[in-house]
């Protein structure tokens, strides 16, 4: 089976999960962002035992108005887009390629955070990504596009990039979700209260 066929099969599965939520798939987002036909996937066959058909991120290179860029698009349809050891390695590799080429790196964010099933390995992966963000600072443009939740450990990397674009009503940046807040503190909060907007700040402060 060709790489294109594998990507198509994976994308069809993702559509069944993403489209009912009003969200696009990882591949659809890349196709909209990049020049038509320019996307070349990196490490498509690098997967974990839990997800042999594809991990929770799609990485690669392409062009925007003819200019080369490197990209990674988190796939919420695979374990909530959570970051495990393999996902971290794929992101780090494409960031290294961007640094070597002196080209922008664009991260499309749609992740529930660390993959708790992998324990400390997922947290170490985040630490390595944050380190790479700092290493790349001032050397290449780093751009985050928040198109879904970017929760827990996933919230910090965008904060270290140069630009953050967030989809209204869908993109969410927060450290801890309402369920965890209620479990730990007993306080009930809405997602709106967790989002950093002036309207939410006024509403939640009373």
Question: What would you call each of these model-derived segments?
Answer:
Residues 22, 71, 110, 158, ...:
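Residue-level signature of catalytic and energy-coupling elements of molecular machines
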Residues 103, 109-117, 134-177:
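Glycine-rich beta-to-alpha active-site loop
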Residues 196-203:
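Conserved small/polar residues in nucleotide/adenosyl-binding loops
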Residues 181:
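N-terminal cationic and glycine-rich segments that engage phosphates or anionic surfaces
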Residues 61-75, 90-116:
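A structural preference for short, pocket-lining loop segments at secondary-structure junctions
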Residues 74-80, 86, 108-128:
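Glycine- (often His-adjacent) and acidic-residue-rich active-site loop
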Residues 1-69, 73-80:
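Intrinsically disordered, low-complexity segments enriched in small/flexible residues
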Residues 86-101, 118-146:
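An acidic, glycine-rich surface segment that forms the CoA-thioester-binding/catalytic face
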């Amino acid at each position: 089976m060709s790489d294109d066929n594998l990507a198509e099969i994976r994308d069809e599965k993702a559509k069944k999960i993403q489209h009912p939520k009003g969200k696009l798939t990882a591949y659809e987002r890349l196709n909209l962002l990049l020049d038509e036909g320019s996307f070349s996937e990196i490490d498509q066959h690098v997967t974990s035992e839990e997800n042999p058909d594809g991990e929770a991120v799609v990485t690669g290179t392409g062009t925007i108005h003819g200019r080369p860029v490197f990209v990674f698009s988190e796939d919420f349809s695979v374990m909530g887009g959570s970051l495990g050891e393999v996902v971290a390695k794929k992101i780090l590799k494409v960031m290294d390629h961007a640094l070597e080429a002196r080209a922008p790196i664009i991260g499309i964010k749609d992740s529930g955070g660390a993959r708790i099933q992998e324990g400390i390995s997922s947290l170490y992966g985040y630490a390595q990504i944050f380190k790479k963000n700092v290493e790349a600072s001032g050397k290449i443009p780093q751009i985050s596009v928040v198109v879904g939740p970017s929760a827990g450990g996933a919230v910090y990397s965008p904060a270290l990039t140069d630009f953050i674009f967030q989809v209204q009503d869908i993109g969410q940046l927060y450290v801890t979700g309402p369920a965890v807040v209620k479990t730990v503190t007993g306080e009930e909060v809405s997602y709106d209260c967790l989002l950093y907007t002036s309207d939410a700040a006024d509403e939640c402060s009373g």
